């Protein structure tokens, strides 16, 4: 669980650092130069409150969702025999953890988004554009990398422990197929991030007029390119793992599910002569 938690937190921490630095440079600093001295104080307070509450809530919620998988893995390592119903639950929960941490991250970023403008106040229209831009970039980061990294841990390390002879069903294959489809969407998000940052840099740099902000976007662009390479590697490993897990699920499936998956009603019946 600690490994998954760190893999989910790291992209969000990096996104929070970028969000703070970018908003400080393009919004708060110009506001103080315009004589709005309270903007700096309100921004600092809102950053502390939002990040403390957001990271605490996100961590607690993910620990709650991942705890059954952690306990199931501990029981497996201690030689405890797990019931088929519990194994089915653990397989589903294990595969969904990547999607859960991505949704938790995005939801918390969306909720936190309006807090900064409301706390600071006295914003110009361009400041709202910068807030939305920063939020969109951080949302992509918060969704993409936690999903791929946590899903990689689940498919590569954890899932096989919850497969036992006769315990798998057609629902397991269906969920594996869903994860197979989701991974393509997150890979496209990872690939879109560098292009989004470059486009925003070209559009916003003349408007911002800040060299530091341009450097931040440049660093994020190179970081997004490196992140895409990592995301592509995770994607390929997950793809191979899913193919193996589908074979294992089929091999350990029940005869009932085999009959449900394939319709033999049209085949001729061979009788005794």
Please tell me what each predicted stretch does.
Residues 169, 223, 227, 243-246:
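Sparse, context-dependent recognition of short Cys/His-centered cofactor- or disulfide-binding micro-motifs
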Residues 1-222:
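N-terminal sensory and localization modules of signal-transduction and trafficking proteins
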């Amino acid at each position: 669980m600690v490994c998954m938690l760190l893999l989910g937190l790291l992209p969000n921490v990096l996104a929070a650092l970028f969000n703070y630095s970018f908003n400080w440079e393009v919004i708060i600093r110009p506001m103080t130069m315009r004589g709005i001295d309270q903007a700096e104080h309100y921004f600092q307070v809102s950053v502390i409150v939002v990040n403390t509450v957001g990271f605490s809530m996100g961590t607690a919620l993910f620990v709650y969702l991942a705890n059954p998988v952690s306990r199931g893995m501990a029981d497996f390592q201690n030689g405890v025999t797990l019931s088929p119903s519990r194994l089915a639950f653990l397989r589903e929960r294990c595969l969904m953890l990547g999607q859960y941490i991505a949704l938790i991250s995005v939801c918390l970023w969306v909720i936190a988004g309006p807090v900064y403008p409301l706390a600071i106040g006295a914003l110009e229209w361009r400041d709202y554009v910068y807030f939305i831009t920063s939020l969109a970039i951080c949302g992509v980061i918060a969704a993409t990398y936690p999903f791929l990294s946590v899903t990689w841990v689940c498919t590569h390390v954890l899932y096989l422990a919850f497969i036992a002879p006769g315990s798998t069903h057609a629902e397991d294959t269906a969920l594996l197929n869903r994860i197979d489809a989701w991974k393509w969407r997150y890979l496209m998000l990872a690939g879109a991030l560098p292009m989004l940052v470059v486009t925003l840099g070209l559009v916003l740099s003349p408007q911002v007029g800040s060299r530091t902000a341009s450097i931040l976007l440049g660093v994020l662009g190179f970081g997004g390119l490196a992140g895409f390479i990592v995301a592509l590697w995770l994607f390929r490993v997950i793809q191979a793992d899913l193919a193996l897990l589908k074979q294992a699920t089929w091999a350990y499936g029940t005869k009932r599910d085999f009959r449900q998956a394939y319709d033999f009603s049209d085949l001729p019946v061979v009788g005794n002569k």
